[in-house]
Amino acid sequence: MASIDGLPPLREVIRAHGLSAKRQLGQNFLLDLNLTAKIARLAGDLTNSDVLEVGPGPGGLTRGLLAEGARRVLAIEKDARCLPALAEVAAAWPGRLEVLNADALEVDVAARLTPPIRIVANLPYNVGTELLTRWLSSDWPPFWESLTLMFQKEVAERIVAKPGSKAYGRLALLSQWRTDPKIVLTLPPDAFTPPPSIHSAVVHFTRLEAPRHPADPKVLARVTAMAFNQRRKMLRSSLKGLVPDIETVLREAGIEPTQRAEEIPLEGFCALARRLAG
């Protein structure tokens, strides 16, 4: 990568700028430029796309995205210590990198980017799930074409989980309702500085133009929240109080009242949401 952008290896970058990952910000720096380039390639053809990156840190993935031909990258970094390193990346790729020192949860990113837009990020562990939920809960089709995101491996497995498994829950339902998510890369702890205690995984989400099954998003969100907040209870108990005769509504949706949330596929929850919406 250094031969492409003329910048030094990332270990030299963090040493020169005195950078160290802050656990309270959910940071773990990925310093292998071969891996960051691979993640950028897994995002697909970037040549005609704007790219949103959250938590770029010292800019390893940022460099990969630019080298893979991203039209423009908006990198949102909360940690001001990383800004000088990112400024060096911006100087190496004139006019193609905008660095925003902000909290990604508070930025209207769609207003700052030009479609088509792809989101590619090694998400900070402490906000990754919240950001994903927001991106999946927006008006559909959303402002983005695809998501290529790194999570703790446990979270990635929850995203792709199937009914009947311990990992299956609301995150799987929301992800699989509107996208086709796949784990495309697993990384060991020693790929990062400092090494986290767990493995990480990259998930690529291909958006669907329409949800797999019709359902009102707000009703579906409420039903799944109630069902999985008490996942070991029978649905007739966990959903009690939702409507006067929940057992009848469950049966009309093709669900036995004695079943539990983890047994019900996406299609079943969507059918239940439609019955409740009337």
Swiss-Prot record:
GO molecular function: 16S rRNA (adenine(1518)-N(6)/adenine(1519)-N(6))-dimethyltransferase activity; RNA binding
Binding site for S-adenosyl-L-methionine: 28, 30, 55, 77, 103, 122
Subcellular location: Cytoplasm
Organism domain of life: Bacteria
Keyword Cell membrane: no
InterPro entries reported for this sequence: KsgA/Erm, rRNA_Ade_diMease-like_C, rRNA_Ade_Mease_Trfase_CS, rRNA_Ade_methylase_Trfase_N, rRNA_adenine_dimethylase, SAM-dependent_MTases_sf
Recorded GO CC terms: cytosol
Keyword Methyltransferase (UniProt): yes
Gene3D superfamilies: Ribosomal RNA adenine dimethylase-like, domain 2 (1.10.8.100), Vaccinia Virus protein VP39 (3.40.50.150)
Catalysed conversion reaction: adenosine(1518)/adenosine(1519) in 16S rRNA + 4 S-adenosyl-L-methionine = N(6)-dimethyladenosine(1518)/N(6)-dimethyladenosine(1519) in 16S rRNA + 4 S-adenosyl-L-homocysteine + 4 H(+)
Main location: cytoplasm
UniProt EC number: 2.1.1.182
Xref: SMART domains: rADc (SM00650)
Disulfide-bonded cysteines: none
Pfam families listed in its UniProt record: RrnaAD (PF00398)
Keywords: Cytoplasm, Methyltransferase, RNA-binding, rRNA processing, S-adenosyl-L-methionine, Transferase
Class in the EC hierarchy, top level: transferase
NCBIfam families, per database record: ksgA (TIGR00755)
Family of this protein: Belongs to the class I-like SAM-binding methyltransferase superfamily. rRNA adenine N(6)-methyltransferase family. RsmA subfamily.
Entry function: Specifically dimethylates two adjacent adenosines (A1518 and A1519) in the loop of a conserved hairpin near the 3'-end of 16S rRNA in the 30S particle. May play a critical role in biogenesis of 30S subunits.
Stated name of the protein: Ribosomal RNA small subunit methyltransferase A
The encoding gene: rsmA
